[in-house]
Amino acid sequence: MQNSASEFLKPRLIDVQPVSATQARVAMEPFERGYAYTLGNALRRILLSSMPGFAPTEVSIAGVLHEYSALDGVREDVVDILLNLKGVVFKLHGRDSVLLTLKKEGEGAVRASDIDLPHDVEVVNPDHVICHLAAGGKIDMEIKVEKGRGYQPAPARVKQDDNRQIGTILLDASFSPLRRVSFSVESARVEQRTDLDRLVMDIETNGVIEPEEAVRSAARILIDQLSIFADLQGTTVEVVEERAPQVDPILLRPVDDLELTVRSANCLKAENIYYIGDLIQRTETELLKTPNLGRKSLNEIKEVLASKGLTLGMKLENWPPAGLEKP
């Protein structure tokens, strides 16, 4: 039956009851029996795991080398400061990351409103307390805020080529703007049918996104993920095999083809230089360090390479090519 999907009831009534600026109850009905549980659970999981948000990911504090330090004139230790900083709710408009500064001195509370913000960055909870300064105390910090999804522990963002400055502290980042999502299923009735369901979702956000918009976004994600199942005979994604980059054939020739003197050729092979591609990546300094290879032999090599349009010290990507063996 091609039109069997149209035989199912679709929810026609959607009731949104705001509880507060960040909390709402969304009710939808009617559903066929069991569908409210299926869709409610799917939407809840997407809401909690897949909504984009913003969180501080890196912090550097003047005079602090690691999170187990303490600051003179600051009531809280660094661990407590970082925990409080995670509670600041940021909202970035039109950008994915930003570096913010916070400088304050003098006795009193340091709040999120004390952070220096550009025009396209907003703090949703400006009264949130980060730390307390004693008389004569001061604090100077830089905060990196990024956009992301879900939860990312600090070690997962460490890269091998990371050039972070000493004293930069990585934070575990919880990007999700959803604080709480729950759902319940009640009985619903349409005319004489009483075997229907009503889905009620209680949603609380951190203020970055409205509860109603969060449900819309989650539904769009679910529809997009399920669309491929609607037509299993549809267009498949063609997998294009990545071809190996072309290598100049002359680079694959053995150094013996350069017709160097026996002395020079033996010196190169002793350094595991078997192909012309191996040779041109060496510099003059490296070759002069080769035992028994002097300036005269070096000049000979340079002249032969020049006759073929090559020089020493060239850089080759993807060398040696796959399958290349010693001659």
UniProtKB/Swiss-Prot annotation:
InterPro entries given in the database record: DNA-dir_RNA_pol_insert, DNA-dir_RNA_pol_RpoA/D/Rpb3, DNA-dir_RpoA, RBP11-like, RNAP_asu_C, RNApol_insert_sf
Any one GO CC term of the record: DNA-directed RNA polymerase complex
SMART domains: RPOLD
Region ranges (Alpha N-terminal domain (alpha-NTD)): 1-233
Reaction(s) catalysed by this chain's protein: RNA(n) + a ribonucleoside 5'-triphosphate = RNA(n+1) + diphosphate
GO biological process terms held by the UniProt record: DNA-templated transcription
Keyword Iron-sulfur: no
Chain spans, region Alpha C-terminal domain (alpha-CTD): 247-327
EC number, UniProt record: 2.7.7.6
Keywords, ordered alphabetically: DNA-directed RNA polymerase, Nucleotidyltransferase, Transcription, Transferase
Disulfide bonding pattern of the chain: none
Superkingdom in the source lineage: Bacteria
Top EC category: transferase
GO molecular function ontology, one term from the record: protein dimerization activity
Keyword Phosphoprotein: no
Cited CDD domains: RNAP_alpha_NTD (cd06928)
Pfam families referenced in this protein's UniProt entry, alphabetically: RNA_pol_A_bac, RNA_pol_A_CTD, RNA_pol_L
Known function: DNA-dependent RNA polymerase catalyzes the transcription of DNA into RNA using the four ribonucleoside triphosphates as substrates.
Family label: Belongs to the RNA polymerase alpha chain family.
Entry remark concerning the domains of this protein: The N-terminal domain is essential for RNAP assembly and basal transcription, whereas the C-terminal domain is involved in interaction with transcriptional regulators and with upstream promoter elements.
Subunit structure: Homodimer. The RNAP catalytic core consists of 2 alpha, 1 beta, 1 beta' and 1 omega subunit. When a sigma factor is associated with the core the holoenzyme is formed, which can initiate transcription.
HAMAP family: RNApol_bact_RpoA
Protein name, UniProt field: DNA-directed RNA polymerase subunit alpha
UniProt source species: Laribacter hongkongensis (strain HLHK9)
